[in-house]
C-alpha cells in the first residue's frame, strides 16, 4: 500500500494537490458546505471524455480541461467521473471508470475503480467510490428517495449534438 504522499505523486496528472496544504481537507470542506446548503440531491458530472477520443485514431494533444464545478469539489482532472451529493444522508459518492492498465500504458496513470482497492478513496477523501456502471442505479434510487421534492440539481457538460 502506497503512502498518501506517493499516491499524490503517482496521480499528480489527474488529482490536484499541494505539498503546502491538505488538499483532501480543502475539497472535503467544499463538499460539506454544498451538502449543508442543498435541499435535494445534486449531480456533478465531469467532462465525459478526453478531447478527440470519441473515435478511433483521433486522439489529439489538446489539453484536457475539467468541468469547473466538479474540479472545485473533487480536485479530479480526469474524464468520465461523477460526484453525487445527498443532503438527506449527508453522503458523497464518487463514480470513476474502472481501472484500465492498457489505457494507462498510452495516456498515463488514471484514477480508476478496482475491487478492494482504496487508492481513490484515500487520495480524494471520498469514502464511497464506485464504478461508473453503477451510476444509473444510484440515480434511480435517489429519484425515488426525493420523489416528493420534485427536483434535483445537475451540473453537467451537455454532450448532445443538436
Regions found by a protein language model. Give the residues of each.
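A composition/biophysics-driven feature that prefers long, compositionally simple stretches
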Residues: 1-162
Amino acid at each position: 500500500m502506497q503512502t498518501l504522499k506517493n499516491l499524490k505523486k503517482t496521480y499528480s496528472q489527474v488529482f490536484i494537490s499541494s505539498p503546502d496544504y491538505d488538499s483532501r481537507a480543502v475539497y472535503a470542506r467544499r463538499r460539506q458546505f454544498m451538502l449543508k446548503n442543498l435541499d435535494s440531491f445534486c449531480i456533478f458530472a465531469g467532462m465525459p471524455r478526453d478531447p478527440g477520443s470519441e473515435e478511433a485514431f483521433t486522439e489529439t494533444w489538446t489539453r484536457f480541461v475539467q468541468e469547473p464545478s466538479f474540479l472545485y469539489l473533487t480536485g479530479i482532472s480526469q474524464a468520465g467521473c461523477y460526484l453525487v451529493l445527498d443532503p438527506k444522508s449527508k453522503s458523497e459518492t464518487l463514480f470513476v471508470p474502472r481501472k484500465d492498465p492498457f489505457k494507462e500504458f498510452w495516456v498515463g496513470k488514471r484514477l480508476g475503480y478496482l475491487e478492494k482497492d482504496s487508492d481513490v478513496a484515500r487520495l480524494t477523501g471520498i469514502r464511497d467510490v464506485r464504478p461508473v456502471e453503477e451510476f444509473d442505479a444510484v440515480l434511480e434510487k435517489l429519484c425515488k428517495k426525493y420523489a416528493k421534492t420534485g427536483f434535483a440539481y445537475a451540473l453537467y457538460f451537455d454532450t448532445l449534438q443538436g
